[in-house]
Amino acid sequence: MFKALNNCSFFNHLRRGRKKMAEKSKILIIGGTGYIGKFIVEAGAKSGHPTFLLVREATLSDPAKAPLIESFKKSGVTLIIGDLYDHASLVKAFKQVDVVISTVGHNQLGDQGKIIAAIKEAGNIKKFYPSEFGNDVDRTNAVEPAKTAFAIKAQIRRAIEAEGIPHTYVSSNCFAGYFLPTLAQPSGSAPPRDKVVILGDGNAKGITHICCFCFQIIHPF
């Protein structure tokens, strides 16, 4: 299933699905201390859903993560010790919840196959949201480095579908906060000073002709 949702409607979507159940869905977030994950965890706690966060032992002992972890605890989030690379810990965690939300980062996108395998073994997950939160990879023609990342996301989608796991893909398009600090420079950490990298051949158009699109939209009326 394809959906384009923001954080608020993300959990409204879960509420609508919950009408068929007697109580609120229990939600587990993987990667919840990362760039996007922390906002998903916060939204889950505020929504009233029992919210669980999979955390590694190393994360709990990381001083840099301590304030964030403490804020999660104060908001009622339940911490579950586990690891993406520990199959048994994933299965054990999944058996305690109804919904799994993955917010793993770029380097772990391909490793979501481990989540899929654990969901299949647990056998109780009602909905899986893989780490997406960008362009709809089945409808986007990208250049590198995005092309490789999109291909990995597409592979994960096909694996989810092949296993028959109930799912929703959340495609919310680009994040200005991710691209603007570096002026969209790949692997940059600050705005460019000496040169600018232009992806592709430099001739790609974001919008070919806005007027044409407007009249195509109103044509049926």
Placement of each model-derived feature along the sequence:
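Cytosolic, low-complexity regulatory segments enriched in Ser/Pro/Gly with interspersed Lys/Arg
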Residues: 5-11, 15-19
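An anion/phosphate-binding loop that grips the pyrophosphate of nucleotide cofactors and donors
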Residues: 97
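Receiver (REC) domain switch-region micro-motif
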Residues: 100
